[in-house]
Amino acid sequence: MVLFQFYICTFITFNYYKFVLKVDSSSRRLLVIGCGGRARIQRYLSGYKQIRYEQELITDALDQRARIQRYLSGYKQIRYEQELITRKNYGEILNKYLSSGDILLDLAYNLETRCLLKWCHDHQVCFINTSVELWEPFGEAYKNDPRLLTLYHRQMQLIEMQNDITWNQKGPTAILDHGCNPGLVSHFVKRALIDMAQYVLKQKGIQIVDSEKIKLENALKVKDYPQLAYLLGVKTIHISERDTQLTKDPKKVNEFVNTWSIEGFVEEGAAPAEMGWGTHEKNLPNGIYFHKQKEGPCNQVCLATNGINTWVRSWVPSGEIIGMVIRHGEAYGISKYLTIRNEDDNNNNDILYRPTVHYAYLPTDSAISSLIEFRMHNYQLQPKLRILNDDVIDGADEVGVLLLGGHYVSAWWTGSVLDIHQARKLVPGQNATTLQVAISLVAALTYCLKHPNEGICLPDDIDSEEILDICLPYLGTWVSKAANWPEENDKIRKDWQFTSFQVEN
């Protein structure tokens, strides 16, 4: 049995101002697990105007005091201790720090979501995380079938747990996959569909048959997002991201450099490429695997190749990119949420509409160099790891959703362009990437306080306007516009097939 060390970074007793949130949270406590790049959230929470601290306990498997010393010194109510979480003792540790009505925020990697989720459900504790995790993601049993390494497989395990007769269907709110991506990008999709529909009705209305125009207006009025995507003709959704943050300290030999959790990046990048599979897809890429029919929604496929070796063409506001199809939770959540079934039959095979959904990620130059070295070392992680932060001198993180193949608008991008200078003005001590994650987590915490009894939710299941109202002021330049991409004679435009986007590695 392999024991992983995880970081319990912050244990926070907090109040939200009643006049802001209209809820009484004075007795709630928040435990944050994790002290990597994502977990620098505590720096942001310490300064967030809607949160007032009374007590905070930070514990970690390692001595991380130096990383947050100014917060330990600046807030008298904060304590720091060291702790180790394993599959054997997680219940004991959670019992020590949490009780009914509290919130657990899990930012660690390889800390099994099912275990934490079940404990929180049984103890009436709300739960938030940024990804669905396992204790041992690369066990021997997974080697013969890449489908067992997918996030889809993990989601099916969660569904199986919820279908058990001992599970109360509602219970405390648990928001899964709510970082930036997965997380915010699900809310970006909804905003993109609204903006795109309004643009089409205003600018392209003369091209639309009256009956279709009425349908589009009705779907817009009631915010029926699957119908909007279907009526607009959206065939593919890229979660397109380019990170151009530049360090003054170049990557060294045998060092992995990134702007966020390196261990998390390597784990998901080395896993099979995974995507939501659209109903318009006719051409099958090499090495494709389908999931067994009638076992879940069957909205995803995976490839035999891993994510960091699967590349596609995509686009962000700064221009065309080539990005990696790394597995991400939003590919499951968005494609499932936008699925439309024939009304007379709920059979898994009887799907009227679903878009293809996947990540297209181009990280920093430092991270690209690190990945090349990682591959050169036969996928063994470098001995030195470094997360870029104060050493970043320029650059931005462009992350959004690219809706492609529409009847009236061929491409529409909605998302955040946050440069390092904007990020530092908003919250000192953050890079652009961690701030985009941090504010999403704050929004999820706020949602939990206002809606504490909604059971298990993906980002697609909760009110996007509530989330975006909090997040938009911290996302830098907000973009939601038609994109002139690809060019008219590009092969992609012929039928918007996944294989047309693919690039030889």
Task: Name these PLM-found stretches.
Residues 195-505:
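C-terminal catalytic/substrate-binding lobe primarily of soluble NAD(P)-dependent oxidoreductases
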Residues 85-96:
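Conserved Rossmann-fold cofactor-binding substructure of NAD(P)-dependent oxidoreductases
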Residues 32-34:
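Conserved N-terminal Rossmann-fold NAD(P)-binding element of oxidoreductases
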Residues 76-87:
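Rossmann-fold cofactor-recognition segment
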Residues 109-110, 119-143:
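ADP-ribose/adenylate-binding Rossmann-like module
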Residues 38:
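Hydrophobic/small residue at the entry helix of a nucleotide-binding pocket
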Residues 6-27:
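A short, basic/flexible loop-to-alpha-helix module at the beginning of a structural domain
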Residues 131-170:
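Rossmann-fold NAD(P)-binding glycine/threonine-rich loop
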